Amino acid sequence: MAKNVVVLGTQWGDEGKGKVVDLLTDKATYVVRYQGGHNAGHTLVIDGEKTVLHLIPSGILRENVTCVIGNGVVLSPEALLKESAMLEERGVPVKERLRISEACPLILPFHVELDLAREKARGDKPIGTTGRGIGPAYEDKVSRRGLRVGDLFNPTDFAVKLKEVLEYHNFMLTNYYKVEPVSYEKTLADALAVADILKAMVVDVTDVLDRARKRGDEIMFEGAQGTLLDIDHGTYPYVTSSNTTVGGVATGAGFGPLHLDYVLGIVKAYTTRVGSGPFPTELGCDVGQHLGIKGHEFGATTGRKRRTGWFDAVAMKRAVQINSITGFCLTKLDVLDGLETLSICTGYKHADGTVKDVPPMAADDYELITPVYEEMPGWSENSFGVTEYDNLPQAAKNYIKRLEELTGVPIDIISTGPDRNETIVLRHPFEV
């Protein structure tokens, strides 16, 4: 029987979702993005060749897959064309494989300028956005003044709507942030220039996916960022502007939640975070540097150095609660090779001395907690590139088993390297 599978991050993003999606798409007919924008960075390594995608779903490299960008994604025409050109230069027929919802909010130049101006105005307390206009575009959507892909197909009305929203934002840019206004004429011309290109890819996403489900096609939903960056459930306000959790599938792709069969949570064997915000298990010592260097922990989108820390089972419990995770994919296990001792956070100690196994909701509350650790022996053997579970070091197996016990969820896939072939699949999400 056909399966509909969600693949999402369970930490602060950068868990390795791109590789896993690419690995699993050999059995998928559709791969769907349902939230975020080109602030995501999904890195694929296939036969040693590296590809970084920010907006287009990771399944685009598969001939058998139709990729879909749902209404929950904020779409930058400029970013889409740039990414499409990069792929087409490598022989990938993007226009044949990609479909887009006409309800996608557009990211336009003034959104980018607002994003940059706001981060600068925050001084030494930035949110840590990518500066790509994601948040301002979602704000316009919620405020019901945003322009959508479908608006481009009526140039006269689009010009009027653009003038109104640009006057509003230019007032803020010039009077409050004291920066230059964005040109109406150039913004209009650039936007309308891509209208026909986008129109050729526009479909009714909800209807397409529903028909696919009824035909028995396999559908995969590809999340961006991670659970702990969710606008509602993350470490607010140090979060992204969309719902990165499983609920985003229903709202961002118009796909009924009762039709989802399996939720695969991608989780690193340790923890990383880019930008500002709480990070209870963060390491400022040599071990943290080791994880960062060996794990190549630099953001695929911004190039920023990622903060590193131990595995946080408390945060993962929340991710399991929110997402109804069926199974985990544990990534970057090989980065732990050579460490004598490993630590796992099993609780948060509060100021009153109590220890809780669930995280607080607000970022400020994290300042009052101390992580409680459980130590485990590390391993000196090499796990890099291992493709059979029995060939893993025994201490690595013990570590995996303990993570399963603490989260209450089985680890169905283990990634031991960046290439799609450097993987141990214990249970395939499309086959369970």
From Swiss-Prot:
EC number: 6.3.4.4
Keywords annotated in UniProt: Cytoplasm, GTP-binding, Ligase, Magnesium, Metal-binding, Nucleotide-binding, Purine biosynthesis
Location(s) in or outside the cell: Cytoplasm
One Gene Ontology biological process: IMP metabolic process
First-listed, main subcellular location of the protein, grouped into a coarse class: cytoplasm
Binding residue positions for Mg(2+): D14, G41
Binding-site residues for IMP, renumbered to this chain: D14, E15, G16, K17, N39, A40, G41, H42, T130, R144, Q225, T240, R304
Protein name: Adenylosuccinate synthetase
Originating organism: Pseudoalteromonas atlantica (strain T6c / ATCC BAA-1087)
